[in-house]
Amino acid sequence: VDKGSYLPRPTPPRPIYNRN
């Protein structure tokens, strides 16, 4: 779920939402 990558998920703070 890339659309939910910017959401507070139980994952490390990586710039997933910052990728073009």
Curated annotation (Swiss-Prot):
Which intervals carry biased composition (Pro residues)?
9-20
One GO cellular component, as annotated: extracellular region
GO terms under biological process: defense response to bacterium; innate immune response
PTM info: O-linked glycan consists of a Gal-GalNAc disaccharide, O-glycosylation is essential for full biological activity.
Which stretches of sequence are listed as region Disordered? 1-20
Where in or outside the cell it occurs: the entry states: Secreted
Q: Is Glycoprotein there in the keyword field?
A: yes
Positions glycosylated per UniProt:
11
- Principal subcellular localisation of the protein: secreted
Q: Which UniProt keywords apply?
A: Antibiotic, Antimicrobial, Glycoprotein, Immunity, Innate immunity, Secreted
The UniProt function text for this chain reads: Antibacterial peptide. Affects Gram-negative bacteria E.coli 1106, P.aeruginosa, E.coli D22 and E.cloacae and Gram-positive bacteria M.luteus and B.subtilis.
Give the similarity note: Belongs to the drosocin family.
Its recorded name reads Pyrrhocoricin
